[in-house]
Amino acid sequence: MAEEKSSGCSPESCSSCAHAGSCSSAKKDLKAPANPYSQVKKVIGVVSGKGGVGKSMVTASLARMMVQQGYSVGILDADITGPSIPKMYGVHGSAVGSEAGMFPCVAKDGTKIMSVNLLLEHESDPVIWRGPVIAGVVTQFWTDVMWGDLDFLFVDMPPGTGDVPLTVFQSLPVDGVVIVTSPQDLVQMIVEKAYNMAKKMNIPVLGLVENYSYLECPDCGKKISVFGESHIDEIAEKLGVEVLGKMPIDPKLAEIVEQEKFYEADNQYLKNRSEERRVGKECRSRW
């Protein structure tokens, strides 16, 4: 039975309400309007049930794959307290704006990026905000940023099922989510949490991506399961979703990230990786 809404409940407070998925107020359309200078065709959330699975890496990999195939792409970095997307692309400095809104920063490959790190005086300054404030900033990245014409906007979300994922699902017109995981013992329970949240919010799950799936020996080519054997296929079958890819641990990719040159990743990593191409193909084929 649905939870009764608390006294003083209103649609505006849903982003931080424990009963947002079940009360009558939550069923209203709370979608925030996009900036008038934004024409975004598809919004894809990249989520995970827990941290440490390389979600930002998968987000950037999906974005690079789309750019490589000629699409216009943006990344909304919704991981407010742990942003990493700008640094991966070598994007520094401050975002600028006008009366019409904020301009996203543009990486060397044309990827448009907005992140809280682009608004801080110093990149190393911590963001010590409570949940509702963080959720409000994420919404503003949609309403106040002039994204322009985009084929895909990828939303890199913080791990878990808290305020930010709830805000994104309620406030942005999310067309689908990709769930990122890794081969560990508790993976099934964690994946199911993310999956169940998306389903409760009526967001389509495009599929699962397993990161850190294996390490390929540079001498013999043998695939080594560093973090244990993969269970992603069984989990996907149980949930009735696709396995979009199994991404390996690749020292070359780590080096690109360290050099802040992810805009070159198509030449050094993605170009010959059929797994990542398959992920991109799946995202396109759903529409």
Task: Please state what every model-predicted region is.
Residues 2-28, 197-278:
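C-terminal lobe/tail of nucleotide-utilizing enzymes
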Residues 40, 51, 77, 85, ...:
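Residue-level signature of catalytic and energy-coupling elements of molecular machines
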Residues 146, 165-186:
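Inter-motif core of Ras-like GTPase G domains
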Residues 275-287:
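Single conserved hydrophobic/aromatic residue that forms the stacking wall/gate
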Residues 37, 42-80, 195:
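Walker A/P-loop phosphate-binding motif and the immediately C-terminal alpha-helix
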Residues 72-73, 78-123, 128, 135:
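Phosphate-binding loop that captures ATP/GTP phosphates
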